[in-house]
Design a protein with these regions (language model features):
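Generic beta-strand/beta-sheet core signal
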Residues: 24, 50, 88, 115-119, ...
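Metal-coordinating catalytic core of metallo-dependent amide/deamination hydrolases
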Residues: 68-69, 73-76, 80-83, 180, ...
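Catalytic alpha/beta core domains of metabolic enzymes, predominantly
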Residues: 90-287
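Alpha/beta enzyme core
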Residues: 1-116, 129-137
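Terminal or standalone catalytic/regulatory effector modules within metabolic enzymes
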Residues: 199-205, 209, 213-438
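Proline-centered turn/helix-capping motifs that create local helix->coil transitions or kinks
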Residues: 189-193, 427, 440
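Structured functional modules or segments
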Residues: 445-447
């Protein structure tokens, strides 16, 4: 994003109550992080600068990202103004003994709190946290038990009990945590259709190295492309692509780039050898081309030059920091676009449009069509009301609507049903097009 968009977002987030900003770059590029660190400090907020973990510091064969690499980066982040150093282990690759060595080394290298974030995909995250606690880690990320494990974080309650008898056992109200977990235990089943998290440990993550937040998304993409029967091939190709790209650090957006290339290769039955042999006639995914152009920065130790030349097909890569090549956004022009959409013209709306123009536009259109459906309870939103059911909807503080569904009529020739309901005790009717019913009445063509 252009620098003025990044700065505006941080200022607005701080204004709206965000106190701690976790700042990371998908390629661990410090130059891409400086602007955010400086802006957060200008806002008198906490800049938590993250080093993204990949590889295995215990494996001498994976020496690109060794212990010295992470220690040196932590020192650079501290010098750049970070208040906290985060270890962002987005795929859950940090093994227990590696966490002890890494946290110990960082505690010796910088006089800042160390915050560890990992995922439970391998099943080893609790042990990883326990060893990090032994090494002096200051903060770890956990999840409520009902939302934990799989590609999520380990359970906070489980960690509490795992550290029983340890001098650094967290001083938390575990009964209150368990009560909150029971709430999420009730809510989670409503989202089952979108919940593709594996409910069992899968140490294969140490092989494919796919971030926890990407695993389910890529699986859905594979399903949409008709590749779910070849999911094992996709996972294998994901790792192959990562190594082709130079043993890449994989976190948004670099992880998506690797995923796009893996799907592209499996869908087209391409091997690594095919890429080098036929690359001049292949139409690579846009995200892959932009990556090799340097639009998200330059990987540690640079691009694999031969592959870069094949993908770019004679185009020149960018020079310098990507943000320096982007002109500032004209916020007044964005306000004019919001006016055309009949969207609220607020600082937050402008920033949202700058960050996600299509998503924001689709959301505005949906609100225009259906109103603010976020006020509905989850079962009603997903499944609708049953005949005789009554719900209460708070549309703003102190303003409650009581709605009761009374009757749904038969569909007419146009596929229209009359829905009868009570609105705050008063009878109402509305005609709704049933999209599951084919109209039997033929419409006359206009002249």
């Amino acid at each position: 994003y252009p620098d003025n968009v990044v700065k505006e977002f941080i200022h607005l987030a701080a204004k709206n109550g965000v106190d701690v900003f976790r700042i990371f770059d998908s390629l661990n590029g410090l130059d891409n992080m400086r602007l955010s660190i400086d802006t957060v400090r200008e806002c008198n907020k906490v800049a938590e600068a993250a080093l993204c973990y990949t590889g295995d510091i215990l494996d001498p064969r994976r020496d690109k990202y060794d212990l010295k690499y992470y220690v040196d980066m932590a020192k650079e982040l501290a010098a750049a103004g970070a208040n906290i150093i985060a270890i962002k282990d987005m795929a859950g690759l940090l093994k227990p003994e590696a966490s002890y060595r890494l946290v110990s080394a960082l505690k010796d290298a910088v006089d800042l709190p160390i915050h560890l974030h990992t995922h439970e995909g391998s099943g080893n995250a609790i042990y990883t946290y326990a060893r990090a606690v032994d090494a002096g880690v200051d903060i770890v990320d956990t999840a409520m038990s009902a939302m934990s494990c799989g590609t999520s974080q380990p359970s906070g309650s489980s960690l509490y009990y795992a550290l029983s008898g340890h001098p650094r056992q967290p001083r938390v109200d575990v009964d209150a945590m368990n009560e909150l977990s029971r709430y999420w235990e009730t809510v989670r089943p409503y989202y089952k259709a979108a919940d593709q998290t594996e409910l069992f440990p899968n140490p294969e993550v140490y092989v494919h190295e796919m971030p926890g937040g990407q695993y389910t998304n890529l699986k859905q993409q594979a399903t949409a492309l008709g590749l779910i029967e070849r999911w094992e091939e996709v996972k294998d190709m994901y790792h192959r692509v990562s190594m082709m790209f130079g043993d890449l650090i994989k976190v948004t957006p670099s992880s998506k780039i690797v995923g796009d290339m893996a799907l592209f290769m499996v869908q087209n039955d391409l091997s690594e050898e095919d890429i080098y042999a036929k690359g001049d006639v292949l139409d690579f995914p846009a995200s892959v081309v932009e990556f090799f152009e340097g639009r998200i920065g330059v990987p540690y130790q640079g691009f694999p030059q031969k592959l870069q030349q094949i993908v770019l097909k004679g185009r020149k890569p960018l020079e310098g920091r990507p943000g320096d090549t982007l002109p500032p956004v004209n916020f007044e022009e964005i306000k004019a676009k919001l006016a055309e959409l009949e969207a609220p013209i607020t600082e937050e709306a402008v920033s949202s449009y700058c960050l996600y123009p299509k998503v924001f536009t689709d959301w505005v259109k949906r609100v225009h069509d259906f109103g603010d459906v976020s006020v509905l309870d989850t079962p009603t939103f997903f499944f609708g009301m049953k005949i005789g059911e009554e719900i209460k909807v708070e549309i703003e503080q102190g303003k409650m609507l009581v709605i009761k569904l009374v009757h749904i009529g038969e569909a007419n020739a146009d596929g229209i049903r009359t829905v009868s309901f009570e609105f705050n005790g008063l009878p109402r009717e509305i005609d709704i097009k049933d999209r599951n019913v084919k109209a039997t009445k033929k419409k006359k063509k206009k002249a």
